[in-house]
Amino acid sequence: MEPGGDHRSRSSGGRGGPGPAVASARGRRLPPAGSSGSAEPEEDEGGQDLQLEGGALGSWGSAPLPSSRARGPASSGRKYSDHCEARASRPGKSRIPGRDHRRYYHDHWRLEYLMDFNPARHGMVCMVCGSSLATLKLSTIKRHIRQKHPYSLHWSPREKEVISNSWDAHLGLGACGEAEGLGVQGAEEEEEEEEEEEEEGAGVPACPPKGPGKAPAGGGCRRQRRGGPVAPRARRLRLSASRRAGGSRGLGARRLERRLKESLQNWFRAECLMDYDPRGNRLVCMACGRALPSLHLDDIRAHVLEVHPGSLGLSGPQRSALLQAWGGQPEALSELTQSPPGDDLAPQDLTGKSRDSASAAGAPSSQDLSPPDVKEEAGWVPERPGPAEEEEELEEGEGERAGVPGRSPRGRAHRRHPQERWRLEYLMELDGGRRGLVCGVCGGALASLKMSTIERHIRRRHPGSTRLGGPVQALIAREWSEKAAHLLALGPPRPESPQGPIPPGTAAASDEGGGDEEEEPEEEEEEWGDVPLSPGAPLERPAEEEEDEEDGQEPGGLALPPPPPPPPPPPPRSREQRRNYQPRWRGEYLMDYDGSRRGLVCMVCGGALATLKVSTIKRHILQVHPFSMDFTPEERQTILEAYEEAALRCYGHEGFGPPAPAPRDGGADLKSGAVCRA
């Protein structure tokens, strides 16, 4: 038999073929491995016979194996069968150093720490904030959570599952098992169904398989060329599963869409404290009840940082309590989170009323922040959001007429939108004439609508106003409102004041429909820059009046400002170290400010301090005269009176003045310490 076998294999090279039975058998076995039909040349039969096993192996190697490791698509072109599309780490293979960093990612990190794997960069992505982590380490995960969002550690497993489903919905992966079954179904399964129909129409019943390696040479050959020997069985299984799932595709798709919307809403509620309004496709803040212009994360971040930054530090139980309170009674929660009812006395009403009338007279513009149906039906809008929104719209209109196209609240446009909380929190009022801010404590005009400008102004002019309580701030706001109303009543006969650049601004404001009302806050700001406030002002007013006197401004009642009318002091004076001097140091530490040296002088020993810092004051007291810490209030008052009397005798006014006084006794250096030693 061996020679015969050798003769068959050698004779198949091209001289003569084998018998007809062998040729017919080989003709049946060639199509699965070959690339041609059933008709093959006789001289190539031997070569095809030698390539049969290799071709079959090649087709088996290219066919998708029903293995647990081959979870990704079979045609991805990767070298290894376990692709990075799977979520967990590789189940049973050793590590490949330098190639697959996925070996460090664990599936339980997804629900325990809300960390997903990004196969594109072989790293982790936080599903809470979207940040990319540097390494695949548990320590990196814990450090990221502690630094970015420690409150997520207190979330329940159900809340974490909501975040995970929302993340999958965001990536388009499907939020649950049904989502994966329905989301993956799509064009691929439709194509498979079409292929199945074509195969059924091509004669699948007419050509049933007769054996493990035998197949008819008709349509079945085309079918086997497509997927290999085991492809039809796997395709039938997949298509039967797709048919069962496709039977309820319409109902499942609707259910999936509803679940995704619910999970997205729950994610906004748990993470951002934002409730989603499906009717208007908007977000409503659960801390203040205001509607946001869009679903963009930049708008959410800007709103939280500008309106209530304290909500970022809420713990998990506090957030849960806020969610429960919002779900139970949103109106009561909005009343609790809103400003005190003293807003009616705030000077914002002076411009708000005029802008209310102006907006009522004109055509109603598109209010992106609060649609009327959401206001009336959901009850999510606070008591008085109208004036603030109309101010923003009017200011946007002013920017457009001035040549600035209307932009979204993100970017530089946020400088045109003052915040209502500035009235009582920082005692800052909007000046409609020049589109700036006016300080309700000292009457100074601020250059821009920025928090940094407000904080710098308060730190330089009256740092003690930050420690005022709510009743004192309400009293100052009430007095400011009364004085502003009085100035508005006296406003019409005063437009002839020497104000060069004001008429164009007021003319542009009059185009908006509120020109007269917006012209008067400008006069109010310029007059209040020189007029001291009523006795309800804080203790920092004497220092401010002293600065005004040093600058040479006359504190007249209604005197007109000089031709250069900026109320703040000149830049050299505003940038000196005096801005860091706290008036309370005078009574608390017995420290006075020396304007000639721009430093501190101790009233007890007369020593000069190097820097304007509390640490320097305390170190000086501990090193030189620690007994002064035990002084009673009466003793401190006695030292203050003696110091002021000596200063009056030496310099002609209380304390050290701005100019350095010339020595009177032939070069004797005058110090305030002589007062206490005397």
Curated annotation (Swiss-Prot):
Superkingdom to which the source organism belongs: Eukaryota
Record-level GO BP terms: negative regulation of DNA-templated transcription
Record Pfam families: zf-C2H2_12
Keywords on record: Chromosomal rearrangement, Isopeptide bond, Ubl conjugation
Extent of Acidic residues compositional bias: 187-201, 388-398, 513-529, 543-553
Biased composition (Basic and acidic residues): 79-88, 573-583
UniProt protein name: Zinc finger translocation-associated protein
Taxonomic lineage: Eukaryota, Metazoa, Chordata, Craniata, Vertebrata
Gene: ZFTA
